[in-house]
From Swiss-Prot:
GO biological process per UniProt: mRNA pseudouridine synthesis; tRNA pseudouridine synthesis
GO MF assignments: RNA binding; tRNA pseudouridine(55) synthase activity
Catalytic activity as recorded in UniProt: uridine(55) in tRNA = pseudouridine(55) in tRNA
NCBIfam families, per database record: TruB
CDD domains xref list: PseudoU_synth_EcTruB, PUA_TruB_bacterial
Protein name per the record: tRNA pseudouridine synthase B
Length: 310
């Protein structure tokens, strides 16, 4: 096998549900998975802070075309907040900027977290990956450069108080895309009057994907020593990313048209008026995503024909 072909990698498609280790950037974790699988192409569905652990769906090959659907999905986190200390980054990796005595109890915390449930405008931390004039905000923060603060509308669906011990509060948070848990914890600390920062963060759900299916880098590395068979067995199909979309089944003739970018008639769907559909063959082979227009399914994102085994 030529060196050029080795560099090109394998043309495989699927999703790895990685449990990102603490202290590693999401991009570093992504590159580790890509190398282990020797994949041609890889991407993830939304970064986690280096401090955080938990579900990081890594998309390989054609699955990268559908990563946006999980970027836009709801997320769930288990977070530990340390009360009494604020930091520059609102987590344990930042410098301490304020310390105050903690005089709260379970009832006070339970009442405070209710204030953050629902739709609200949130100002992300200046130590975030959001862009300003093409650079992430953390670039300006590290240079000591002030930039205009922008708010974004987010929704916190629920917050459950799991535990309080000394100055540590553990919460389970379900929220919309774009929610910064560090900012939420900092705001909670301000409301309690003592300050707070994130000391542990674990993402335990993305859309309807739960943490039970996660694998670690150590598990992947062990399997890689034996070849690709064990690794490939852990791949989930690309349509795992599309659980929120209804599915429509198409015939063999319609499959050919769809893969060539042609619209196909929208079958009767018992009143379902969804604008986007997950398209599959009669044998449950995933083909892509279609958008409805004039009672037809128009291909929006399609698995490349060479990756479809008809």
């Amino acid at each position: 096998m030529s060196k050029a072909r080795l560099r090109k990698g394998r043309a495989l498609t699927g999703v790895v549900l990685l449990n990102k280790p603490q202290g590693m950037s999401s991009n570093h974790a992504l590159q580790r998975v890509k190398r282990l699988y020797n994949a041609q192409k890889a991407g993830h569905t939304g970064a986690l802070d280096p401090l955080a652990t938990g579900i990081l769906p890594v998309c390989l090959g054609e699955a990268t075309k559908f990563s946006q659907y999980l970027l836009d999905a709801d997320k769930a986190y288990r977070v530990e907040a340390t009360l009494g200390v604020r930091t520059t980054t609102s987590d344990a990796e930042g410098e301490v900027v304020e310390e105050k005595p903690v005089a709260v109890d379970t009832a006070k915390v339970a009442d405070a977290i209710k204030q953050f449930i629902g739709e609200q405008d949130q100002s992300p931390s200046i130590y975030s990956a959001l862009k300003h004039e093409g650079r992430p905000l953390y670039y300006y923060a590290r240079q000591g450069i002030e930039v205009p603060k922008k708010t974004r509308t987010i929704t916190v669906h629920s917050i459950e108080l799991l535990n309080i011990q000394d100055n540590k509060v553990t919460l389970q948070v379900s929220c919309s895309k774009g929610t910064y848990i560090r900012t939420l914890v900092d705001d909670l600390g301000q409301l309690l009057g003592c300050g707070a920062h994130v000391s542990m963060l674990h993402r335990n759900a993305v859309a309807d994907i739960a943490e039970a299916a996660m694998v670690t880098l150590e598990q992947l590395e062990t399997l890689a020593e034996e070849g690709y068979e064990g690794l490939d067995a852990l791949l989930h199909p690309a349509d795992l990313l599309l659980g929120q979309l209804p599915e429509v089944t198409v015939t063999q003739a319609q499959t050919r048209d769809f893969l060539h970018g042609q619209p196909i008639p929208l079958p009767e769907q018992n009143g379902n008026d969804a604008e986007e559909w997950r398209v599959a063959t009669e044998n449950s082979l995933f083909l892509g995503v279609a958008r409805v227009k004039n009672a037809e399914l128009w291909p929006r994102r399609v698995i490349a024909r060479e990756h479809v085994d008809l």
